[in-house]
Amino acid sequence: MSEPHRVQFTSVPGSLNPAFLKKSRKEEVGGTEQHQDCEPAAAAVRITLTLFEPDHKRCPEFFYPELVKNIRGKVKGLHPGDKKKDVLDPFNDEEKERHKVEALARKFEEKYGGKKRRKDRIQDLIDMGYGYDESDSFIDNSEAYDELVPASLTTKYGGFYINSGTLQFRQASESEDDFIKEKKKKSPKKRKLKEGGEKIKKKKKDDTYDKEKKSKKSKFSKAGFTALNASKEKKKKKYSGSLSVREMLKKFQKEKEAQKKREEEHKPVAVSSIEAQGLRELEGTSDPLLSLFGSTSDNDLLQAATAMDSLTDLDLEQLLSESPEGSPFRDMDDGSDSLGVGLDQEFRQPSSFPEGLPIPLEKRVKELAQAARAAEGESKQKFFTQDINGILLDIEVQTRELTSQIRSGVFAYLASFLPCSKDALVKRARKLHLYEQGGRLKEPLQKLKDAIGRAMPEQVAKYQDECQAHTQAKVAKMLEEEKDKEQRERICSDEEEDEEKGGRRIMGPRKKFQWNDEIRELLCQVVKIKLESRDLERNSKAQAWEDCVKAFLDAEVKPLWPKGWMQARTLFKESRRGHGHLTSLLAKKKVIAPSKIKMKESSVKLDKKVSVPSGQHGGPTTLLSEHQGGGLNTGANSREHPSQATCGLTDSVSVTLEDSLDEDLVRNPASSVDAVSKELATLNSRAANSSEFTLPTPSKAPTEKVGGVLCTEEKRNFAKPSSSAPPPTNALQSPLNFLAEQALALGQSSQEKKPEGSGFKELSCQGPLSKGVPELHPSKAKHHNLPRTSHGPQAAAPVPGPQVKVFHAGTQQQKSFTPPSPFVNKLQGPKATSPQCHRSLLQLVKTAAKGQAFHATMPASSGSSPASSSSAHKTTASNSTTISHPAKLHPTSSVGPSYKNNPFAGSVSKHGASSSSPSPGGGAQVQSSVSGASLPGVQSPSAGQSASRAAPSSAVKKTPVTQKLTLVAPPGGPNGDSGGGTQGVAKLLTSSLKPAAVSSVTSSTSLPKGTGGAVLLSNTSSLSLLSSSYKSNNPKLPGAMNSNSLGIITQFPLHVLSFNADSSAKAGVSKDAIVTGPAPGTFHHGLSHSLLAGLHSSPPHTAPLPHAAVSTHVPQSLPDASQLHGKGPVVPRKL
């Protein structure tokens, strides 16, 4: 099988690869005949190397493959057959490739090979544009220097550069012959192609035509300006002299005509003989350029080469049209026709001496012109000596006072003498002036720097002292904050903490430089000098002036101060006296808008004073309900608004504590109060149309006052919260404040607190409601009077001042619990049954029976102040569940039955269920918290409806009696006390009372069918907790009820605040209600939303019980607050 493979490999004719042969022989023969077979193919090669002593220039180098090739080449040369075979060898690709390249190189050398370098022909240089269309604007050969440089010269650094200025030349050395060949190869090639065909002829003449064209342009179209290369042209007048240019041109003309005839007569094949003849003709003479300038010495040659680039912009035929006469150094005033003089005449015609110059300026211009003539032929660097620069600077300064036209004429005139163009001369003069002005600035800047150096040490030392003091104060403050941290957490809600942090943020001492008159004066002086040195002509806009001053101050003046001590804007402001006349043209007064944080702080302060609710999460619901609370007497509206409130609540539940959901109320406190007043007025007008009751017009001023006083007083009353309590939030406080404000507007005159028992305080406020001025108990003079004018529907009937008793049940507070959105939805669901509410009430009664020494907390709200307040003010006993302690409650004020044999007897009237079901946001909300997990906002109409309608009549017939409300709230206010809870409950009472009927009877009768707007709307009527009159003189309430079902919740103490409210202004029924509400900070999400939403969604009815009221005491660890509602109320626990 191996044989066919070998045949395939060796089938190519020619000698086989030695390696391949070796391998095959090894395999077959075993290597015995290997040497004989391989000898012919791989003959031994002897190489002789001659070594020499290496030095720094060279050392012996040998390339073995090359040596072997050379020797084998000789051998192959002896055997042409072998060579042939070697080329055909398929494995010798390198050799084949080399042969191909050599053949290709020979071919190109024959075709394009460089001929002997010929001398430049004068015709090529003078008439380069011959035959081109001079009207063609596309061709531009103005920079084709390479066509003009003599063969014996080269550029200084080799090569040609477009638009890089004047070229400098040097003699070409023999060692650079290759470079010159490469560079000069174009000329003969172009010449040959030109003679050979039209196409290349045009390419060759590209360069020269545009030179002529550009020179004509500069001469004729720009008559008012000198050529940019005017200086170069002047240099050539030195070298004009020995040769008659006219004779040369005649000779060139004859040559051209003869050449044309030859081209027409002879075929292109004859081109080479014609060219050879022309070359022989020209070779006999010296370099035409040398003959043109009349000298062949190297020195003159270099000078001529230096002047050659000026030919770029000249029309040589015109410039050389007159034969030169005289010495190349003759004076300019000589009117001869030298090359330079002709040039000067051509280009100096437009720039005549300007007239009307001041005598000093005219004198300086003539001096400069005379100096230019004396130094004629000098380069720019040599010409502009110190004296010339001084004269030019003087001319620049004087021409600044003249018009721009005269100034331009002066420089145009000077440019005709000087070795530079007008633009270059103007730039040089401006630079000299700026440099001189910069020298003027050095001294004032140094003075300013010295003054700053004298002032800085003292200020730096002062700054360091301030930094040290600041550091010490910061450390002290940190220590103090650590000590007060727990107390501050209890006192401040989240929002207040954020605001205080923002307000208290203490920045370190600033590096503020203290200016003195000396430094300010030096700064203004520096700025004035800088402005004087600025070009007034080109920078006349005020904005440009301002930018210039700012850039100067930032770049040159600001660094004079140590880093961080000065800012450019401060420098600009302090130096306004120096630049104001230029920079103030476009200056605008900047109106600095107050920062949002400051606005928020001020509005919060205003809120504290005016008692406008600013709860974090109650805001949107409150606003929604306020604006929508107008016409809610129809069942459709009442259903509509609870859903809207529900949406607002669910949306806001997930909001973080830092978000103020009541921002509108915070920013527009007056508008929110106005909205409430308008709403109450609307309710009043609607109620006036009904036969059952009339609502008096509310007054909003007292609400604001009393709210503010109440806030401050409650803060004082509960000044000492337990340190273990978590920091409360404002979320509850704001809506409660709003509600309490309304409740207090009903006529509570004053509040006072005194410590009682184990940490209990009694706040008793007595005062006739009609007067609105509180009477203080002598023993409680430390508290503020709470002036109250009658506010809302209850203000109609004066009622004796009630006593308000506040009990601190304990110091523990539960953390705020935000009910989840699904739970809120459950609370707002429309399908709660009244039996559930009754069941919850019964459970509440049972737990109350088990309670120890506290009054019954409101069953409807397991700690929800709004429910009880609403029940007390707006519901009669018939339509509310009355829970009374037999020893301490009068049943007289309660229309419904009261159970006296139980510590907490709840009279749950069917009217309540019926009334709540028709009410869009009334008593239903109170029981919703009691009703348990479902807590529907929509009440199904039941038999209780008829009872609720019947109850109002009986209630209306009763005589007006004082109404007492007992609010139970856990500790925790803005200051860590339970004042926030009291205030919140009071506000809740009022808010629920304002829109609702004055008496519970009236509210129940007037309640239209609908769903409660609050989250915790219930089917049952609002609960009048302890509706039978409660003895105000009895300071103690029944002990905390331990609810088995709510064991987790019962551990949190509640404060009990009892105060009377004139709720039965029209019905004339006095009621005592105990409202249990959590501390304002314990829950900030659900309560405020549900309260406000329910409150405003059903204005004419009892206040909605917020879902938050139920969930306030539920720890956040609980999975769902809805589990707790049906199990019993949260009651105060005796410590």
Curated annotation (Swiss-Prot):
Q: Which residues carry this modification: Phosphoserine?
A: S173, S175, S323, S336, S338, S493, S660, S677, S1028
Q: Which gene encodes it?
A: Ubn1
Expression sites (tissue/organ): Expressed in bile canaliculi in liver, in bronchiolar epithelium in lung and in tubular structures of gland ducts inside the olfactory epithelium and tongue epithelium.
Query: What is the recorded name of this protein?
Result: Ubinuclein-1
One GO cellular component term of this record is: bicellular tight junction
Locate the N6-acetyllysine modifications and list their residues.
K222
Give GO terms for biological process: keratinocyte differentiation; nucleosome assembly
Which residue stretches, if any, does this entry annotate as coiled coil? 476-539
